[in-house]
């Protein structure tokens, strides 16, 4: 199987990720932070080592401001729900994932908040000037997807974040497609909150996510319960990270995420360059196939994502045919209907290709040849 669905989750994982998870399960699979015996302490040390590695990688000065979650969706929900109040205004774009749009819709449907959607320019990019004009005294949060789940186009988040800072509005970045690939830190993005999965560019396992918080940004917790601290009180502790990490943490997942971060950190830029070369090769080959439309502006910066629509608009059929011939891609709306509505592809959807760290040129050439054969 040629795996080109790395925008959904990276696969295969580095061998050290598998080993780290196995070791945690086999040798010290106790409950971190829930006991004083040796195994619980060892489990806790692994959790904190991962937190420290993530904090260093993400430019978070205090490791306790890196919060473990199950995925990017949970990180986004924690940030959104925890930062909003009745009467708040939220600004986001047509590029947002349902992990942003559905939480917002719940509160809009209750007449508790209002949402402004910013339209991108012809290149698919958001304008800092347009954002500046959109912000009002009611704006409580600005949310931007760093790179589109559909087209891969990278937004000018640093400039957008500077506008938010200038206007005193918290800025949340959805780094689902960029963490572990681009330089994603609080300072480089001018972000106050960064939500990300552990299982994509960071090369960790499923069921892992992170939320990075700038000092002074303290959303209300999403889940309340046991933290292993302040157990004498029925009130949720204010101590970080305990405030946000109720319940048993995913020790095997966090052990694997630590190994993933250690794999990515020293070679992030090279991984990005290599994935970009492979994606450029793929786009060039797909452009030569009659009957395919490639989504997204050619001149816009992008991560290694390419989405196409076949003539006739049956993206699901093309994705299924590729699967039957040994190529794993994703067809449909990619949980981003607002973007497809903007692109005019709500009915057709698209077929998304996303090379990863272990993709080869041969994989790209073979996949393109199969697409060409299927489009005849």
Regions found by a protein language model. Name each.
Residues 1-376:
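Pyridoxal 5′-phosphate
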């Amino acid at each position: 199987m040629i795996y080109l669905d790395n925008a959904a989750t990276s696969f295969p994982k580095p061998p050290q990720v598998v080993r780290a998870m196995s070791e945690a399960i086999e040798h010290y699979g106790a409950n971190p932070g829930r006991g004083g015996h040796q195994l619980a302490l060892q489990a806790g040390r692994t959790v904190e080592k991962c937190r420290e590695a993530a904090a260093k990688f993400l430019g978070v000065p205090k490791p306790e401001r890196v919060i473990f979650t199950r995925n990017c969706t949970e990180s986004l929900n924690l940030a959104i729900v925890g930062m909003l109040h009745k009467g708040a205004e939220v600004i986001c774009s047509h590029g947002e994932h349902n992990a942003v749009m559905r939480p917002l819709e719940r509160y809009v449907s209750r007449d508790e908040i209002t949402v402004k959607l910013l339209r991108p320019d012809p290149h698919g990019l958001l304008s800092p000037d347009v954002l500046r004009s959109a912000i009002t005294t009611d704006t409580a949060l600005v949310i931007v997807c760093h790179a589109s789940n559909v087209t891969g186009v990278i937004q000018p988040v640093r400039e957008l974040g500077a506008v938010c800072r200038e206007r005193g509005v918290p800025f949340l970045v959805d780094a689902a497609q960029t963490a572990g690939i681009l330089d994603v830190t609080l300072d480089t993005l001018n972000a106050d909150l960064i939500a990300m999965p552990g299982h994509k560019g960071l090369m960790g396992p499923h069921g892992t996510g992170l939320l990075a918080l700038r000092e002074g940004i303290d959303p209300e917790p999403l889940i309340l319960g046991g933290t292993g601290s302040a157990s004498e009180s029925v009130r949720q502790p204010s101590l970080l990270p305990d405030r946000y990490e109720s319940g048993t943490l995913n020790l095997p997942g966090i052990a694997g995420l630590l190994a993933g971060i250690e794999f990515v950190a020293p070679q992030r830029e090279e991984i990005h360059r290599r994935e970009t070369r492979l994606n450029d090769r793929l786009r060039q080959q797909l452009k030569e196939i009659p009957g395919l439309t490639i989504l997204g502006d050619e001149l816009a910066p992008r991560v290694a994502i390419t989405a196409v629509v076949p003539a006739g608009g049956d993206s699901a059929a093309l994705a299924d045919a590729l699967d039957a011939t040994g190529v794993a891609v994703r067809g449909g709306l990619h949980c981003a209907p607002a973007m497809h509505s903007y692109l005019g592809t709500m009915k057709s959807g698209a077929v998304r290709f996303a090379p990863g760290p272990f993709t080869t040129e041969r994989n790209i050439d073979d996949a393109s040849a199969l697409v060409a054969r299927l489009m005849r």
